[in-house]
Amino acid sequence: MEIRKKPNIPMCLVLDSSSRPFMTLLFTILLFLTGLASAVGAVGGSPTAGFKPADDILIDCGSKSSTKTPEGRVFKSDSETVQYIEAKDDIQVSAPPSDKLPSPIYLTAKIFREEAIYKFHLTRPGWHWVRLHFFAFPNDKFDLQQATFSVLTEKYVLLHNFKLSNDNNDSQATVQKEYLLNMTDAQFALRFKPMKGSAAFINGIELVSAPDELISDAGTSLFPVNGFSGLSDYAYQSVYRVNVGGPLITPQNDTLGRTWTPDKEYLKDENLAKDVKTNPTAIIYPPGVTPLIAPQTVYATGAEMADSQTIDPNFNVTWNFPSNPSFHYFIRLHFCDIISKSLNDLYFNVYINGKTAISGLDLSTVAGDLSAPYYKDIVVNSTLMTSELQVQIGPMGEDTGKKNAILNGVEVLKMSNSVNSLDGEFGVDGQRASMGKQGMVATAGFVMMFGAFVGLGAMVYKWKKRPQDWQKRNSFSSWLLPIHAGDSTFMTSKTGSHKSNLYNSALGLGRYFSLSELQEVTKNFDASEIIGVGGFGNVYIGTIDDGTQVAIKRGNPQSEQGITEFHTEIQMLSKLRHRHLVSLIGYCDENAEMILVYEYMSNGPFRDHLYGKNLSPLTWKQRLEICIGAARGLHYLHTGTAQGIIHRDVKSTNILLDEALVAKVADFGLSKDVAFGQNHVSTAVKGSFGYLDPEYFRRQQLTDKSDVYSFGVVLLEALCARPAINPQLPREQVNLAEWAMLWKQKGLLEKIIDPHLVGAVNPESMKKFAEAAEKCLADYGVDRPTMGDVLWNLEYALQLQEAFSQGKAEAEEVETPKPVAVPAAAPTSPAATTAAASERPVSQTEEKDDSTVDQHSGTTMFTQFASLNGR
């Protein structure tokens, strides 16, 4: 083997035939090691590996020469950046060197007594950091502590009437304001505008490109938990960037030159948290997460629950961050499971301002492995803000793996308001922001007070007009209803409602129950109080403080429905009131609980009275009345609100019966609004097997006809008294809809009806009922009737059955003479004729047009002739 070097030619290896195999292997190993080193460098090497900012403009304002910071960054002097500034006159001031300052850029400043503008040409538009550095050092030109000024861009207000002495109590402290702006133009300007009679100043300016993946356009909103899009349309101010459980991270150790502060000053109780750490090289970024989001040093440290090994660690670790309640906030939470020994062993909840932000977080599942970073972006609306932003982590409280929780980092960014301001309520053009929360509260208070006076007047008037016949005092009195003023509700209670109150009436969410109150009424959710079990969780019976018996549905944190459906049901039921819809009384979401409180339905689900529970069989008339009640409830959902509502989970277990067997539709966790004018909602397929609309399944387009199909299956359950799906039966009988329609087409449907109905059903009534079910089960939604049409046919079937029953009773009476003496016949009087006529069924033509009686039994008219409050 020889090595030859030619002039101006790169060195190369020339191998003889004897050494080629060995050298080939050596060369392969060399290439492998080179690639491995590159890979390690990409993950754990240079902090800024993988990203070089297109724009990196650093200015040391007031400096006569360039300045190098401790982290090695070079800020250019005034003379090197003169092309950026437009100012009538500016004053340069400086301070003597000091080792107490974090950077030498704070030793000089530029003072403006009139408006001054810095203009920059961007190499590449997009996300940029804008960092403004301030330090009010003593000088003989101007008292910088008293300088009052604003800083604006073409679109955003960054600082409004800013005064350093107001922003920081420590006059010797430096201040850095960091902003993240999505710049869409090639030009960017910073305007310093002193207040009249004052001055503006600046020590240093940074304008640095940020990676596009730093903030995506979509996140998650808090309460209700929903998707939040349009994040790229906001400007952001970094308020807190915290390395939980770890030390200060300086810009030279961050992937994007950021500063991460320790979390101890924000911890509410340090005794509840325990710092944990691992070697940063153990952190492996999964696909979709890069070191640019946060460096390995953030994910390699964290805080877990202290004493997590105790039998019942029922507490949360809490961090409090002082905040401005007038703004929305963007919260980025960083997680990395560095405490578990195996996968799927750590489940915990995350709360923001007392609301559940993440339920049942399993980091090894969402991140794909242990020691794999994961982050979550959450938008907190200003209506949920107070003077402090609170972040909490805690165990799920169920038997789900290790009772522990972990948090590795927190970033809190203020979001620009409706006039694109990050400071104050005025925009660049002087326009004022929309009414803030305090103004909303004041206005809401006035509306509520006005509504209370109106309601009080109505009560007094009704009291004066009350019935004087005290034997009628048990009759329904409308003046005892809750008083509504807009979306606010006022109610009285025998105990003054000292345990709980109506929560956020502006949201119309009903009464908020404390967890301790619900634990008391359910004997701490004792199994003996369970009256039902569903996919969402257990249902308990209880009696609240005013003596009302209620059903309390406690969500299972591992439920497939989850927190989204929990909030959906609250919002749906809080705005719906109908005789045939179950009423929501209130809810509780304390400590990650998802609890709904309903009116108690003593006779339980419709299904229990048809099969499986050995209850007394329902008569055909009772089944018809129950189906009619459910149809009325669904018809109201589809047409009785400004936006139609599709239930999406109609089935016999979601039709509940009260003590009088009045049917009420329940369980709105999967429901969807349909905007007026739209005929469908494109959404993922959800529902219950056996009731699912085949067209919805094929096209993933949900319509009100999807509910109609499901209701058709319920009708067959009522007729045949068997489940919608029974896999234990022969193959052709498994699916009730297919099996029943097969017999219907043969004209032999009566062969498969509930044996308890044989001989007790009017054939014409059953025929009309079966026709209604068949139409509901049409393959295509366009061929199915509306719920109003279904309701008409069911009421007709009920009238046929009532006529049949009455005729049968009269025939039996004729056949069985009474063993008493019969007086001589007397002439029939007009009164007798009238009485006899009143006993026969009332025909459609004999009904009064203004009749709007809505009884669950004894129907005397068809619903289509009554006011259904439809759209």
From Swiss-Prot:
UniProt-listed Enzyme Commission number(s): 2.7.11.-
Ranges of Polar residues composition bias in the record: 854-871
Parts of the chain on the Extracellular side: 40-439
Side of membrane Cytoplasmic, spans: 461-871
Region (Disordered): 808-871
PROSITE patterns in the record: PROTEIN_KINASE_ATP (PS00107), PROTEIN_KINASE_DOM (PS50011), PROTEIN_KINASE_ST (PS00108)
Disulfide bond sites: none
Active site: D649 (proton acceptor)
Residue ranges of domain Protein kinase in the record: 525-797
Signal peptide limits: 1-39
Compartments it resides in: Membrane
Keywords for the protein's UniProt record, in alphabetical order: ATP-binding, Glycoprotein, Kinase, Membrane, Nucleotide-binding, Serine/threonine-protein kinase, Signal, Transferase, Transmembrane, Transmembrane helix
GO biological processes: regulation of pollen tube growth
Topological relation to the membrane, as annotated: Single-pass type I membrane protein
Residues involved in ATP binding: I531, G532, V533, G534, G535, F536, G537, N538, V539, K553
GO CC annotation: apical plasma membrane
InterPro entries: ANXUR1/2-like, Kinase-like_dom_sf, Malectin-like_Carb-bd_dom, Prot_kinase_dom, Protein_kinase_ATP_BS, Ser-Thr/Tyr_kinase_cat_dom, Ser/Thr_kinase_AS
Gene3D superfamilies: Galactose-binding lectin, Phosphorylase Kinase, domain 1, Transferase(Phosphotransferase) domain 1
Family, as annotated: Belongs to the protein kinase superfamily. Ser/Thr protein kinase family.
The name this protein goes by in its record: Probable receptor-like protein kinase At2g21480
Organism listed in the record: Arabidopsis thaliana
